[in-house]
Amino acid sequence: MKLHLLGCNGWIPGKNETSCFLLEHKNNLIMLDLGTGVSNLDKFKGVLDKYDELTVILSHYHLDHIIGIIYLLPYLKDKKLTIYGPGKPYYALTTEEYLSNLLRTEFFSRPLLKIAKNVICRDYTTDGFQIDDIQIIIKQQIHSSPSFQINIDNKLIYATDTAFQSELFSDISKNTVLLHECWDAVNSGNVKHSSLPLIMKGLQNYDFQKVILIHLNPEWTLAEQRIIHNQIIGTKYCLGKDGKTFDF
């Protein structure tokens, strides 16, 4: 599996764009979330050129995770696009309805079903689903709107926009890479997002390959950045940075 980091910030762009990650796995190209990080696809044209289809899996529908859908247009003119997202019973509308509303003609000149040569939208549930022989495990998280952990073949677990929930990591193994949001440098009692101390404490009894901290807070002060650096130096934790690639 190859993992390309396209958008490691939460909320708004800064040093990084917002949530977007590109995976190459078992001859499939998978994108996690559609934040402004989609704009970094220009740096990965060589990756895109190897595939005829892009599969997107959305964790939820907050704008910093879907607004980049409009940036897909120049890259997918000759490709198939399949988008999985949470629909009913977690949300009132389907994935296709939410994204179609975002791309109404008042807001963008190209409708959803014209973003690529062929566009298919599918709703997922916590029953999970498969992409060819790739197993996708879905678990609901705690957030202001329903968000979902995405586990890909137990090699990569994507957990963003969530309070830390250690019970959701029972599938983790020594070969698992974890993409986990890190919004707070210290534990402030935030019930919608995760702090680094709670993440590190909650995962201390789990064996894993690496934790890449993502959905980073653009408002961190220099003091908070130093706190984080001092906590993760010499550990299996690292801060996500746009443009980086991991091969595992």
Which functions belong to the PLM regions below?
Residues 35-36, 161, 183-184:
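Short glycine-/small-residue-rich Rossmann-like dinucleotide-binding loops
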Residues 1-158, 226-248:
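Binuclear metal-dependent hydrolase catalytic cores
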Residues 60, 161, 215:
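Active-site glycine-centered loops adjacent to acidic/histidine catalytic or metal-binding residues
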Residues 164-246:
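Cap/insert and terminal regions of metallo-dependent hydrolase folds
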